[in-house]
Design a protein with these regions (language model features):
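Phosphate-binding chemistry for phosphorylated carbohydrates and sugar-nucleotides
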Residues: 1-138, 142, 151
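Catalytic-core signal marking the mid-to-C-terminal active-site face
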Residues: 138-205
């Protein structure tokens, strides 16, 4: 159908043609929400995670996300005095870790959001309510606030593999790790759960 969270480009086209300010796309089961702005485009989930965690700034300041989150997320949260705990990819892992760590928020770059204060699972609709609260709080300056947050440039490559059993990811990571010694860089190598590829993410300023 070419719609929903995986087709945010179509939503963006519609709101620009009709001169709407914002648009929201869900996935099939509603645990994921993507937010777009007519001028800015698709709003990065990592930036919303920062702003959501600021709204939820009560007691524990731990935020859970996955290892493939943009390096900018960690930098932004550190600047706020919050702690980022990174897990393997998977919404269930994020939720379980958030519960264990008593985190104020769990989220993935894909647009999955878990709010422990009012839900026991990922919920895109709750994210929408908090998004509206952000719009009300920042009024006409919301996009300027979004622009002010750090977000590193990213190169992403999928490397086809034939025999996954022959790949020692720990050894590969250990060999590459010494090459990435700049605090303004981040390299993640992981095996896809669905496709016969290695996914490589490199963030840099």
């Amino acid at each position: 159908l070419k719609c929903g969270a995986l087709e945010s480009g179509r939503l963006l086209k519609i709101i620009r043609e009709n001169k709407f300010d914002y648009g929201i796309a869900f996935d099939g089961d509603g645990d994921r929400a993507i937010f777009v702005n007519r001028v800015y485009g698709v709003i990065e989930a990592e930036k919303l995670i920062v702003l959501f965690s600021k709204l939820l700034n009560q007691g524990n300041k731990t935020v859970i996300s996955t290892e493939i989150c943009n390096k900018g997320l960690e930098e932004n949260l550190n600047n706020m005095g919050h702690k980022l705990f990174q897990t393997e990819v998977g919404d269930r892992i994020v939720v379980e870790t958030a519960i264990e760590e008593k985190a104020i928020l769990g989220a993935e770059p894909s647009g999955h959001y878990y709010f422990p204060n009012c839900s026991n699972t990922m919920d895109g609709l709750i994210a929408v309510f908090y998004f509206f609260e952000l719009l009300e709080k920042h009024n006409n300056n919301f996009i300027e606030v979004i622009k002010s947050l750090n977000h590193f440039k990213r190169i992403k490559k999928d490397i086809p593999i034939e025999n996954t059993q022959e790949i020692n990811l720990d050894s590969l990571r250990n060999n590459i790790k010494p090459m990435i010694n700049n605090p303004n860089e981040k390299l993640i190598i992981r095996q896809s759960m669905w496709d016969p590829v290695l996914r490589v993410y490199y963030d840099y300023k």
